[in-house]
């Protein structure tokens, strides 16, 4: 029986490259000359910490980071941007969590959606992935298209498609 796995993973090397390119771009920008900002990727916690002189510069750093993520083919849905707060001397700080893997809630939403499509498919949650099996490969391709059209707040990838 044909099957495929639905996962949500983030390439941390590509994320590291996006953060480094964002730092380089910000260093070349005229409005960031002689201003202090920090943009650090914590691979262990899968988080990005941003500190900037003010709220405007913080938003500019976030926008530059998102542009670089798109450039490296990372979906911006994988970034969970927290609200910013003020630290010493008016500086603004925020932390961006990187969503890696499917949560149980998201996985159950996806399986409910698959069941609601009335396609002849079976889905099973296996840790941080969902295994979808069906009798026809066309049904699997159709569910891939339908899942891509939906918004589950995480980027979805389809792996291990077996005929």
Curated annotation (Swiss-Prot):
One of its GO terms (cellular component) is cytosol. Pfam families: DUF520 (PF04461). CDD domains: YajQ_like. Keywords: Nucleotide-binding. Coiled coil: none annotated. The keyword Nucleotidyltransferase does not apply. InterPro entries: DUF520 (IPR007551), UPF0234-like_C (IPR035571), UPF0234_N (IPR035570), YajQ-like_sf (IPR036183). One of its GO terms (molecular function) is nucleotide binding. PANTHER family: UPF0234 PROTEIN YAJQ (PTHR30476:SF0). Nucleotide-binding protein. Belongs to the YajQ family. NCBIfam families: PRK05412.1. This is Nucleotide-binding protein DehaBAV1_1126. The lineage of its organism: Bacteria, Bacillati, Chloroflexota, Dehalococcoidia, Dehalococcoidales.
